[in-house]
């Protein structure tokens, strides 16, 4: 058993319409952020005769997807009836045999050429569109009028676990022959390829043909048996490659048998899969948390410990805040900063786009809303407002009158019943 790391899937090809660049020129390729980007932008940074860096933007219009076969002569071969009703979506008879034994011995009608056939379709204007199954098989007659995507899946193309990239429903378990759409019980990114013509360079042939459909993580080849296992980085790419390479041939006239691979019993494979899942989860957490917080957790910020030791005491000598208290404080500060930032963005000055009478009306409304100057506004460098200071200046303190002490009467008259007193 031999392990082969395939060469990179992307390559740079120089064309006649490519402008000549200086040796110190750098290229930055960017794609429009629209839902259906019809044009692509290429930024060229070069140095002119004066020694200054010049930035040029080259916009190229995306080409439309071309029909892979002639619509007038296109027809699908219906397999021999083995059931009661034929399902055109799965290309099989329901209620009959799972697979015709002669179907696997028939070569595919066409083959997808990504560099030549891919382009934009009607599906690029619809969010959540699926990929064209006939495009993957190389026999789509609609071209730009197709309602499905005509391109390769990327890491940003995420679908529910019970649906594949072509919009077909998965099943609870795999078929006995490991064919079909697959199961939603686990994420399978590995393909089994059988009936390969055995040669000395079988590893290079398998890597060259299967890297066309996406980035490959790992390739295993059993040279003596003519069998290979190809693992893709993305599950959608493995689903696309399975349909694209089914009943195809490599460098010889063999007819490939492409199936889903079973669970690898090797303990190292289980460890690699667990490690990959942990890396994906860690990357998702890194993107969700602030960069400073992630650097502190990973120990990449040496000043974080000093700052926590100083600020975590909360002014109490010898006190060190627990982790939950410190992280709650950091979370509160982070949320407060986000609220301030959001409020600042909402309070940005409004652009004045009115003209003519609308502008005069807007100015009149603003003038009517202004308050009288000295009575309401406060001084910029004082504590009290202008109105308060004016009231204090006009206030005059009157001298308080001395209280008159009450005159005490004779003791003989106290408590007397005589009215003359």
Curated annotation (Swiss-Prot):
SMART domains: RRM. A zinc finger (C3H1-type) spans 126-153. This is Pre-mRNA-splicing factor CWC2. The gene is CWC2. Belongs to the RRM CWC2 family. Residues 1-32, 59-80 are annotated as: Disordered. Associated with the spliceosome. Involved in the first step of pre-mRNA splicing. Required for cell growth and cell cycle control. Plays a role in the levels of the U1, U4, U5 and U6 snRNAs and the maintenance of the U4/U6 snRNA complex. May provide the link between the 'nineteen complex' NTC spliceosome protein complex and the spliceosome through the U6 snRNA. Associates predominantly with U6 snRNAs in assembled active spliceosomes. Binds directly to the internal stem-loop (ISL) domain of the U6 snRNA and to the pre-mRNA intron near the 5' splice site during the activation and catalytic phases of the spliceosome cycle. It comes from the Eukaryota. GO terms for cellular component: Prp19 complex; U2-type catalytic step 1 spliceosome; U2-type catalytic step 2 spliceosome. InterPro entries: Cwc2/Slt11, Cwc2_RRM, Nucleotide-bd_a/b_plait_sf, RBD_domain_sf, RRM_dom, Torus, Znf_CCCH, Znf_CCCH_sf. PANTHER family: PRE-MRNA-SPLICING FACTOR CWC2, PRE-MRNA-SPLICING FACTOR RBM22. The keyword Cell cycle applies. It comes from Leptosphaeria maculans.
